[in-house]
Amino acid sequence: MESLKRWNEERGLWCEKGVQVLLTTIGAFAAFGLMTIAISTDYWLYTRALICNTTNLTAGDDGPPHRGGSGSSEKKDPGGLTHSGLWRICCLEGLKRGVCVKINHFPEDTDYDHDSAEYLLRVVRASSIFPILSAILLLLGGVCVAASRVYKSKRNIILGAGILFVAAGLSNIIGVIVYISANAGEPGPKRDEEKKNHYSYGWSFYFGGLSFILAEVIGVLAVNIYIERSREAHCQSRSDLLKAGGGAGGSGGSGPSAILRLPSYRFRYRRRSRSSSRGSSEASPSRDASPGGPGGPGFASTDISMYTLSRDPSKGSVAAGLASAGGGGGGAGVGAYGGAAGAAGGGGTGSERDRGSSAGFLTLHNAFPKEAASGVTVTVTGPPAAPAPAPPAPAAPAPGTLSKEAAASNTNTLNRKTTPV
């Protein structure tokens, strides 16, 4: 039951991600289509212009111009109704009805300063570079989203698509601002004319604005898809690592937590190199050195972590005999050290002490056998031999006797006294 529930959850998540990618793809091509239609059509602006050569007179009126009651002159002609786009203007009324002409952004009768901001705006408006750039970026973003459905392992594709969509939206809104700022409300040649005509924006202009909104929405959606995929990939890699650690440590009983407790290879390498350099600088241990004394050999803590001290069974009888021999004076020792101590305490001879010291040695075994050298045994000798006894002091002379030197001096004195003069 739990597996079925988990499968349903995974299927729901996958469907949700698939829906997001599908919506992003559809939105990308929809925004591209809207922007393409807006660029290629001539319904950005509705206004009146004198380019159509129309008058306010009725079509069948052949009489003189109509004058007001006060004798005023003919009413000024506001021009015919036109619709314009980024490239041309078309007449809807007058003698040139249905005729479209190219928009002249720089009339001959007008002198423009080439360093002015108005001139630069008209140049950008005439080139229409920002709307075209927006359409190109939208097309590239849609292709990247479609490719991300095929190459699902490459998450950077969907991220690049999101960046392209955001850049396309920014380019679109810049183009709209430039279009409004370049005085596109009156494309007629007379700029000095009093601007009393009303104008309105057409559906091409609104298509461009809708393309901007779609570009920003699908850009945010694409970035969100990238974040979710990256998070899922990170969690999947971490779970795979833990599973691999659990399978490797299952035989040893350590589990996946053993991987987390392992030190880094660099730290182990530094410790090992430091211990090897320290061991090479020290002198090689002699067979008479004690393993626990201050002058003993230094072993690397990383190579041999634990030792057990044991007595060689072949030397047990000799050590026991020495211990029993020295038990009268110094008591029985334990192991090899006990035999040597008993021989020394019992007042034994130097040869017996040497035999005890040579017989009482220890064997060190590595508690964790290694694969390369599983049967290696390190042998270190026992305690150093006792120092040689000092020479015996000369015996004191008995009471009432003279030493040889004193007797010789007395003899010389007697000889002097008995010699005749």
UniProtKB/Swiss-Prot annotation:
The keyword DNA damage appears for this protein: no
The protein here is known as: Voltage-dependent calcium channel gamma-8 subunit
Regions annotated as coiled coil:
none
Lineage per the UniProt record = Eukaryota, Metazoa, Chordata, Craniata, Vertebrata
UniProt keyword list: Calcium, Calcium channel, Calcium transport, Cell membrane, Ion channel, Ion transport, Lipoprotein, Membrane, Palmitate, Phosphoprotein, Postsynaptic cell membrane, Synapse, Transmembrane, Transmembrane helix, Transport, Voltage-gated channel
The encoding gene is: Cacng8
Q: Where is the composition biased (Pro residues)?
A: 384-397
Membership in a protein family? Belongs to the PMP-22/EMP/MP20 family. CACNG subfamily.
Disulphide bond pairs:
none
- Consult the record and explain the modifications the protein receives after translation: Palmitoylated. Probably palmitoylated by ZDHHC3 and ZDHHC7.
* GO terms of molecular function: calcium channel regulator activity; channel regulator activity; ionotropic glutamate receptor binding; protein phosphatase 2B binding; voltage-gated calcium channel activity
Task: Please give the organism.
Answer: Rattus norvegicus (Rat)
* UniProt topology in membrane: Multi-pass membrane protein
- Phosphoserine: which positions carry it? S251, S254
Function statement: Regulates the activity of L-type calcium channels that contain CACNA1C as pore-forming subunit. Regulates the trafficking and gating properties of AMPA-selective glutamate receptors (AMPARs). Promotes their targeting to the cell membrane and synapses and modulates their gating properties by slowing their rates of activation, deactivation and desensitization and by mediating their resensitization. Does not show subunit-specific AMPA receptor regulation and regulates all AMPAR subunits. Thought to stabilize the calcium channel in an inactivated (closed) state.
| Keyword Chloroplast (UniProt) | no
* GO CC aspect terms: AMPA glutamate receptor complex; dendrite membrane; glutamatergic synapse; L-type voltage-gated calcium channel complex; postsynaptic density; postsynaptic density membrane; postsynaptic membrane; Schaffer collateral - CA1 synapse
Spans through the membrane: 19-39, 127-147, 157-177, 207-227, 318-338
Pfam families reported for this sequence: PMP22_Claudin (PF00822)
Origin superkingdom: Eukaryota
